[in-house]
Amino acid sequence: MNIYIAAPFGNYIKPKQSNVIPVIGTYTLERRRGLLWKLLTTLRYDFKEQCWYNSLGLRNPGLAHGIDKITHGEVLSVAAIKPTDYDRLNAQIPLDIPIELNISCPNINHFKDYLKGIGQFQPRNPIL
């Protein structure tokens, strides 16, 4: 059984066990400055819901940086900002890079059909 360490923790925790896999990212097609004013509250634990929240606005240096940074045994987390991004993400990410599709970002609420286009991705091992 594999255990995945979700981003952002996967960016920093690099275990030596072969079945523990870091997920790095999340990356978007273009660089995003994110919501810097949320830096203090971006990673917080909600005791009532018993879960962690991460809402920094997908701040990242862009997909090309993520592709260059990823190493064997890691999963690349990516997110679309608009529906047409899925085709471009699929075209730019090499097939030998496993991916996680971040569809849970609370800051992506400006297009209704957020899941439209996910089926465009070619088979990979794994798609999370």
Cite the ranges covered by each PLM segment.
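Acidic (Asp/Glu)-rich catalytic clusters
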Residues: 16, 67-73, 89-96, 118-122
